[in-house]
Amino acid sequence: AYGLGLKGKNKNFDGSISFEQIVELYLFNANFRQLLFTWIEQIEVNLRCRVANHFSHIYGVLGYEDPDNFNDPGYHYDFLCEIKKEISRNSKAPFVKNFKNNYTDGKIPFYALVELFSFGTLSKFYKNMKPQDKKAVATLYGVGYTYLESWVEHIAFVRNICEIGRAHF
């Protein structure tokens, strides 16, 4: 795949392209992906904390269970199904076991549950927050919530590309 952009109009490599150049392109992309992933990871952790803090403060630690706390209650059911799968998939994680074993209802508070979210799930969660809640989180970054929503969606897309190892150039 790394050599595809180096082919000429006749779909053949020009004589000036070497295997070593294709390897260098691959290595550049691998390093670039790692750099992007490192930056995105910092953004993800920061956003995860701010969303969890705001949402839990306004709606309580189990507020994620109430569809009225979201912009689109219809999406809420899909969200809960996704979360149940994540809890099941991570059932051996120490903090999941702790809440399951030590609390009578076994429910996981949002500030802990958010740790199971993929960046894509975090992006969808933010997108389905009520406008005033999105605005409150976006204000912490000094931007409008429509900008933050768009940026988070695009960052999630780039993160997925980094994760599967596709070329970025």
Regions found by a protein language model. Name each.
Residues 2-168:
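Long, contiguous internal "core" modules enriched in hydrophobic/ aromatic residues
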